[in-house]
Amino acid sequence: MSLEGIGFGYRERAPYASNPAFSRGRLVPEAESPTRTPFQRDRDRIIHSTAFRRLKHKTQVFIAHEGDHYRTRLTHTIEVAQIARALARALRLDEDLAEAVALVHDFGHTPFGHTGEDALNERMKNFGGFDHNAQSLRIVTKLEHRYADFDGLNLSWETLEGLVKHNGPLLGPYAAHPDIPVPQPILDFNARYDLELSRFASLEAQCAAIADDIAYNAHDIDDGLRAGLLTLESLDEVPLAKRLLDIVRTRYPNLDPVRTGHELVRRQITIMVEDLIEEAQRRLASARPGTMEDVHNQPRALVGFSDAMRAEEKVLKRFLFKNLYFHESVVVRRHAADRIVQDLFDACFTDPSLMPDEWRLGCEALDKAALARRVADYLAGMTDNYAVREHRRLFDRTPDLA
């Protein structure tokens, strides 16, 4: 792989990159900024939103109050954005769009991570279900109330498309998960503003999606080591990790375990990023897209790992599921978190007056499905600590997350 100029942002934009000068615009038309591109404005709106600040107090893997140094949704999001920008720069794409998609991709996550999402989806199964990606879309198109002229953030078409389809098309022959119905909130919005759900998203969105994988593959190891749920010796079971650890141990034979873990994590990020850039360049050379439209019309993603790295990543993910995500201590906390979210849903659905004024007003006029969605919107926006406090306020006994 040639590294000439790859880390610098002044190289000419690739012809297949998203170009803000040709943005498809916004649902509510706005005058253009004289100082910022549409994608830069999207990024800035995302950063200044309430939903972005709430990520600080939402769980990644470990419950937020377990320690000050474990990753939250916010720190994870910042790490994803950094990797996404690096990938976009290397491939001569629009860094601002890649960053915007990365920054917004986790907006819809509930308190307590995927446990909270599963709990809400269970309670919402008769009312259209709950999906964090669809919830992210609801937040940026409806639930944020910052602007006088519109609800949401009125993001550009390209950022919305990247948010909804960063993991692949949702419909058609190339759908990433054809057996899973498209969440109703996405279908409802798509009827108003066509995001072309059967086509691949931009390369910038693809960079954001794979940056998410790179970030959590590495940083969950870091947090797992810090928590004592993983050990450097156990990571020798993972071929990729062992190969990198052998390099570290050979070069630094007397290095302490903490720094050894950090050296592993940073090397893993580097090797995955370099593999992805090289593989993306190979796919681009083969597909030879000449425009953004050519990217959308491809039969596969053009940004992805090589077959060899993908195989190694699958082994790593299996290891993390077995030894970290389903570790006994994590599972116990997940059961407690599940109880908290389901209890809160049941209470607020039965008696909407338990919710704050801005959420309960008008509930008496809603049918059951609309009321359930209102309650889900309220609960999904909670931070971990707020959910615990509300449960303690409403119930005599709250499950212990400590």
Swiss-Prot record:
Molecular function in Gene Ontology: dGTPase activity
Where does the HD domain start and stop, copy by copy? 73-217
Instruction: Give UniProt keywords alphabetically.
Output: Hydrolase
InterPro entries on file: dGTPase, dGTPase-like, dNTPase_2, HD/PDEase_dom, HD_domain, HDIG_dom, PHydrolase_assoc_dom
Stored PROSITE patterns: HD
**Which CDD domains does the entry link to?**
HDc
Query: Which GO biological process entries does UniProt record here?
Result: dGTP catabolic process
Q: Which family does it belong to?
A: Belongs to the dGTPase family. Type 2 subfamily.
> What protein name does the entry list?
Deoxyguanosinetriphosphate triphosphohydrolase-like protein
